[in-house]
Amino acid sequence: MQKVTIQEAEHLLQEIISEEDDRFQILIKDERKGVQKLISKWYKQKELAQKEKEKFLEMSKYENALREKGLTYIAGIDEVGRGPLAGPVVTAAVILPEDFYIPGLNDSKKLSEAKRERFYGEIKAKAIAIGVXIVSPQVIDEINIYQATKQAMLDAIANLSCTPEYLLIDAMKLPTPIPQTSIIKGDAKSISISAASIIAKVTRDRMMKELGEKYPAYGFEQHMGYGTKQHLEAIEAHGVLEEHRKSFAPIKDMIQK
């Protein structure tokens, strides 16, 4: 291989997947600083990819154990929006195929918005089934947030196109005959729950951005309904909306004034 330019070396390293590649053996002997920087970057990317693969395998242990027992339709279930002062609680149930693989998958709160959006598209394209349920602030006020979350999870399961054989749920137990396991911080421990958390988070964030357009003075697209200083000041200045949860403090106290 003739001596390549730095740009050509960069393109080659994007193609090379193993140190055993003859082209890599030539590049690693190239003493130019630019090439050595690219080699160092290549090693870091390989290390990151390996860590992501190991993390994904660790997060697949619940699903793999159930598949070894002959189960196929394993649904991960999670919610987003229990804590905010405004907007709905959104839940998702996701059944993934056995060959599903997205390196970097994690709890939706630990991902950037750009990654969440990208993973959302991949999950939608690859999942066997996805069910989503949305519970309004009015229902939350009527039956309380815990019961609303539970009902939303049951609705998300009912909205799946096939009946799950087993449920992996993030920190909840559901009144259903379907066998289940409740996993504390499950969105960081199970790929199915993680996928559900991403579907629920992106769905809710999009809804809150629409509310932000409808009520620009409240900044919903920035705080997603959580009780930030900006949000509380907007409520003081412009009042309580129908999208606010009247049973939540300090909204409840503001209404009673």
From Swiss-Prot:
The membrane-spanning stretches of this chain are none
Q: Which enzyme type, at the first EC level?
A: hydrolase
**Has the keyword S-adenosyl-L-methionine been applied to this entry?**
no
Location in the cell reads: Cytoplasm
Its Enzyme Commission number(s) read 3.1.26.4
GO cellular component terms, alphabetically, are: cytoplasm; ribonuclease H2 complex
Could you give a single Gene Ontology term from the biological process aspect?
DNA replication, removal of RNA primer
InterPro entries in the record, alphabetically?
RNase_HII, RNase_HII/HIII, RNase_HII/HIII_dom, RNaseH-like_sf, RNaseH_sf
The protein's GO terms of the molecular function aspect are: manganese ion binding; RNA binding; RNA-DNA hybrid ribonuclease activity
Catalysis performed (reactions): Endonucleolytic cleavage to 5'-phosphomonoester
Cofactor(s), by name: Mn(2+); Mg(2+)
Q: What does this protein do?
A: Endonuclease that specifically degrades the RNA of RNA-DNA hybrids.
Could you tell me which HAMAP family the record lists for this protein? Answer: RNase_HII_B
Please give the family membership noted in the entry: Belongs to the RNase HII family.
NCBIfam families according to UniProt:
PRK00015.1-1 (NF000594), PRK00015.1-3 (NF000595)
What protein is this chain from? Answer: Ribonuclease HII
Tell me the lineage of the source organism.
Bacteria, Bacillati, Bacillota, Bacilli, Bacillales
